[in-house]
């Protein structure tokens, strides 16, 4: 998936689109070489619209943020977010994200470069991701499975994944590490909530 590769060789052609969600209008700058350049993609919309917003609070992280849709929308919508870190490996997407942060008045968001959790050195109350399926299974699993190492003791992981792209098998694997809840299914997209199974995690560390 293009947002998880650094496509600096593609000629830049910045465009804008507007979208409405949670009774608010947002404007996003996009470009060649980023995921979903012309509109808010359906999977991300499904994730946002099915999040239990009362649980999105404290310190938040998104892995694979692209041009910043999720953190910008959530910090404009949810009052109890203290800070929102958002990372990606695509420098062009991060440049757009900074533009979008200013345009949509989202001062709580901090965008920075990181290959998955490479540059992450703290733990979060909530981690959110629409993982880049086309970047490969290894990247997806690194994002969702390694999240446990970056969650606070009572932290939560929220993801969205398409049924045709392995949602069922991923859910089974997630259950080995997390207590999982299938929040909703919508047109093939599964919105999943994960809470750490601390006893299992601790036993794995001992082994």
Where are these regions (language model features)?
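Conserved SAM-binding loop and adjacent beta-strand
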Residues: 31-48
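Short beta->alpha hinge that forms the Motif I/post-I loop of the SAM-binding pocket
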Residues: 88-90, 139, 162
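A short glycine-rich, Lys/Arg-flanked "PGG" loop and its adjoining helix->strand segment in the class I
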Residues: 141-153
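Conserved beta-strand signature within the Rossmann-like core of class I S-adenosyl-L-methionine
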Residues: 154-161
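Core SAM-dependent methyltransferase catalytic element
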Residues: 185-207
